[in-house]
Amino acid sequence: MALLISLPGGTPAMAQILLLLSSACLHAGNSERSNRKNGFGVNQPESCSGVQGGSIDIPFSFYFPWKLAKDPQMSIAWRWKDFHGEFIYNSSLPFIHEHFKGRLILNWTQGQTSGVLRILNLKESDQTRYFGRVFLQTTEGIQFWQSIPGTQLNVTNATCTPTTLPSTTAATSAHTQNDITEVKSANIGGLDLQTTVGLATAAAVFLVGVLGLIVFLWWKRRRQGQKTKAEIPAREPLETSEKHESVGHEGQCMDPKENPKDNNIVYASISLSSPTSPGTAPNLPVHGNPQEETVYSIVKAK
């Protein structure tokens, strides 16, 4: 294919430059069509950005025209800095570059054609270009290829803040401080109210419990007192009756004085004893003697 360019009054040097540019464009287009026709490649974003100390995900996907073997043994590798740079990760070994120890995670499963490379705890030195590379076993043998442009990673400083006017910043800070103070005051007031209500409730419950205990003890003591008073009168008649029966028994057992008849005078002795009727209360001696005797005499005339 030839391209004819004619420039009126132009120089041969200018014509040669235009021819070179045209041939380069045609070559690039043919190369792209050839890759699409062959059907293999790695897709990655052109660039991505992250914050220092944070994390970043670099997504990737790949495609190919070959038929996979029974055991394709797929593996993913990554390079950095340039197309032929050092390997920083290899899933088949596995291998992680010393610079990325504990900071690389490959979210990819065997057999899948897409995944994500995650870089943790970003550093300023991580800012460079990254290239994904694919290995797999096909019916035609081992095939491998990688991304040509790669992905440019940009790392920004976490301390970077947008510039603002001092007056605006001061006013905003003062307003924010006032809002925070008001919120804290509101929270403290609400907390005091809740505490007061809780203490009042606890005090009321405590007083009710104490009053209930006092009433219970008073009722129990009163009940015991009534029971004691009821038992004492029941015991006193029984003890008095037993005492009187003892006294009466002694009176009945006492033999009257037998005075012999002397000069036609008959002496008789009467002693007090318990009554014949058990229902009648006995009469206690008036004096301190346990038993009183009365002597009567009768004179008989002949």
UniProtKB/Swiss-Prot annotation:
Compositional bias of kind Polar residues: 270-280
Segments crossing the lipid bilayer: 199-219
Motif ITIM motif 2: chain residues: 294-299
Membrane topology, Cytoplasmic segments: 220-302
Cellular component, GO annotation: cell periphery; membrane
Cellular compartment(s): Membrane
Position of the signal peptide: 1-31
Region (Disordered): 228-293
Biased composition (Basic and acidic residues): 228-248
Glycan attachment points: N90, N107
Alphabetized SUPFAM superfamilies for the sequence: Immunoglobulin
InterPro entries: Ig-like_dom_sf, Ig-like_fold, Immunoregulatory_rcpt-like
Motif (ITIM motif 1): 265-270
UniProt function note: Paired receptors consist of highly related activating and inhibitory receptors and are widely involved in the regulation of the immune system. Receptor for CD99 and PIANP.
Subunit relationships: Interacts with CD99.
Name of this chain's protein: Paired immunoglobulin-like type 2 receptor alpha
Annotated source species: Mus musculus (Mouse)
Gene: Pilra
